[in-house]
Amino acid sequence: ELTVERRGIKRQEACSFPPIRLRFEKDEVKGSAFRGETSLKMVTHCKDSERFDQYYLLEMMAYRMYNLITDYSFRVRSLSVNYKDTVKGEVEADRFAFLIEDDSDVAKRNGLKKLEIDRIGPSRLEKTTVGDFSLFQLMIGNLDWSALKGPDPKECCHNVKLVAPRPLEKGDKIWPVPYDFDATGLVDAPYAEPPDHLGLKSVTQRLYR
């Protein structure tokens, strides 16, 4: 048994089939591929048109490209999903999707813990990873992120998770882990727009931030 929840902000507005979160009961997934998991994000096809499958294949590819650069990255797993109308009892679609690793698991793989904080200064970020991170965001044309603060002043960051040693001591470095690549120039989804304050006309324009 699992619980399915809608998630995302932009994609809930743009997609007829938005991304979802799967919540598992630990006892129900023992011995399965999902053992030990309690919650996973699933990226879906967004709209019924088959061309939208290509956008999310490209997004999944972005995650895997970053896996080659650093271990401080989200791993993903592709799926073929049968969606069934539980009222009619009919299979409505067989579509591509992918799962995103939980941020706690990313931290654990790297001997760290996920960090929840309102904001951080740039000097706290681990320099080598930040260099790789920034160049990767430029390469894929990602403008929709912040590793220092989020839209909610009580929560850092925007499309970035933080991992760090715990307890966090003065001088300890923090590692940024990016996610949500659907609005990048690499994917170039029809609903993707650059942030207004950057003064760009298209997400396919590159800007080093």
What are the roles of these predicted feature ranges?
Residues 1-209:
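Phosphate/dinucleotide-binding and metal-coordinating scaffold of catalytic cores
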